């Protein structure tokens, strides 16, 4: 359910919102589950007013059936397609990143996941002039590379500075800080949409594995619950607030050690709507080759198995979409 904010419904003032937040009641779900008598006493609010407020919010946020035609019309008016700035990748993703969806980039160390994320951030901020939130959880984000990508797009220093201002970077090295940050972001985006100010259109999390993997396995039973809470926050951002969410994930070996698969297990596999795999191109030559094969492994629109090739060494400097030998179509 949505974040509590002034004007969400009649009677919900800014003062009431702040008092409720002081009791850690930030969402409609929090208010629905709260003991209103206790809240009224501790916040100094009217019990009857809180009951009426909860009744209105539950009616407003409860699920009502919709037919397919209405859902399709809503989809057409609420969905935007954002170019990644990489022509071959846009082709693979059926024109680009879709708002309302979580897109996952999977690859091993050095496969270019962060480079692709930086290119997406630079293109959305400069070419599309939309705001981006870049959540760095592994220390891979570098401002110098981001500036280099922007310089390849424009020589105008004012435009470069303007694009950099549209990219907000948050460093979050544990899941608890990341969850708090995403919950606060929900309220911020909702408020920005209400005031028609520039809201964040793309959220990039690089990477989810860095904060989730240490919590899984062994006797840490809360790890799976925290991972699914993170998944829920990302899905709410995407679907309810019209944001395109991009996450990166690592590769891990299968149980028999013969094959590689995305990390975080089967439960996480249902989170992204679209998943692409970055891999070093076979026969690329030297160990430091920048040629990468991009394979579509999950998509609601395209057949899986489609492949394209990108050069992470030239991202942002020129559009390259070389033919991939044996490419599936």
Swiss-Prot record:
Give the top-rank taxon of the lineage listed in the UniProt record for this protein.
Eukaryota
Biological process terms in GO annotation: chromosome organization; DNA damage response; DNA strand invasion; double-strand break repair via homologous recombination; interstrand cross-link repair; nucleotide-excision repair; regulation of cell cycle; telomere maintenance
Query: Region labeled preferentially binds ssDNA — which residues?
Result: 1-83
Tissues and organs where the protein is expressed, per its UniProt entry: Highly expressed in brain followed by testis. Also expressed in heart, liver, kidney, spleen, lung and skeletal muscle.
Q: What InterPro entries would the database entry show? A: AAA+_ATPase (IPR003593), DNA_recomb/repair_Rad51_C (IPR013632), DNA_recomb/repair_RecA-like (IPR016467), HRR_RAD51_Paralog (IPR051988), P-loop_NTPase (IPR027417), Rad51D_C (IPR047323), RAD51D_N (IPR048943), RecA_ATP-bd (IPR020588)
Mind telling me which GO cellular component terms the entry cites?
A: centrosome; chromosome, telomeric region; cytoplasm; nucleus; Rad51B-Rad51C-Rad51D-XRCC2 complex; replication fork
Region spans: Interaction with XRCC2: 4-77
Which amino acids does the record list as binding ATP?
Answer: 107-114
PROSITE patterns recorded: RECA_2
Q: Where in the cell is the protein located?
A: Nucleus; Chromosome, Telomere
Transmembrane feature ranges:
none
Q: Keywords in alphabetical order, please.
A: ATP-binding, Chromosome, DNA damage, DNA recombination, DNA repair, DNA-binding, Nucleotide-binding, Nucleus, Telomere
Any one GO MF term held by the record is: gamma-tubulin binding
Q: Which family does it belong to?
A: Belongs to the RecA family. RAD51 subfamily.
Its assembly, as annotated, is: Part of the BCDX2 complex consisting of RAD51B, RAD51C, RAD51D and XRCC2; the complex has a ring-like structure arranged into a flat disc around a central channel. In the absence of DNA, the BCDX2 subcomplex XRCC2:RAD51D formed a multimeric ring structure; in the presence of single-stranded DNA it formed a filamentous structure with the ssDNA. Interacts with SWSAP1 and ZSWIM7; involved in homologous recombination repair. Interacts with BLM; required for stimulation of BLM activity by the BCDX2 subcomplex XRCC2:RAD51D.
The name on file for this protein is DNA repair protein RAD51 homolog 4
* Biological source species: Mus musculus
* Organism lineage string: Eukaryota, Metazoa, Chordata, Craniata, Vertebrata
Give the gene that encodes this protein. Answer: Rad51d
